[in-house]
Amino acid sequence: AVIDDTPTILRTVAILDFEGKGINLQEVQTLTERMRTEIGNTKAVRLIERKAIENIMAEQGLAQSGCVTDECAAEVGQLLGVQYMINGILGKMGDSYTIDAKMFSVETGETVQAVNTTYEGEIEGLLLEMQILSWEIVGLDVPPRLKLQRAGETEKPTMAVIDFDGRG
């Protein structure tokens, strides 16, 4: 059998800071940064650094928090030379938080993947939800460790203790 060792060309992606509705800007930026970090951990895409995005936006006289339309995101994506952009909304309704994120083609504007979740609890719990959505938005299975964390469990090693009487 011939093994194809041609390097896989990774899709290039940039993530804009999410839009916050009922959540303060620092929390939105922290949660967006968690998604950036976790998407980097997936190794499924080539991620553009936040600083590069900020530089392009500064040159264009745009603020990340003000670039909430798909048109603005696509324009930034073209300037960055990326294939895909990820943007989204973090919202608060009563005691619930919502996360809606999508990855779309800069060239066509077509949404290639959309994910969302609703979370009830303290805002810190959204950090884990952002990690889980990061895997889903790039089309990969969520690692068991994250599923366990969501279920309130931690990874525990499995052990067996066997008595040997040593008498062969």
Q: For each predicted feature, which ranges?
A:
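C-terminal/domain-edge helix-coil "capping" segments
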Residues: A1-A14, T32-E33, E38, T42, ...
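Second-shell loop/turn segments in exported
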Residues: D17-E27, Q60-Q64, Y119-E120, D163-G168
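Generic signal for short, ordered secondary-structure residues
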Residues: D17-F18, N55-I56, G109
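Short, solvent-exposed, polar/charged sequence segments at loop or secondary-structure edges
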Residues: Q26-R36, T42-D100, T158-M159
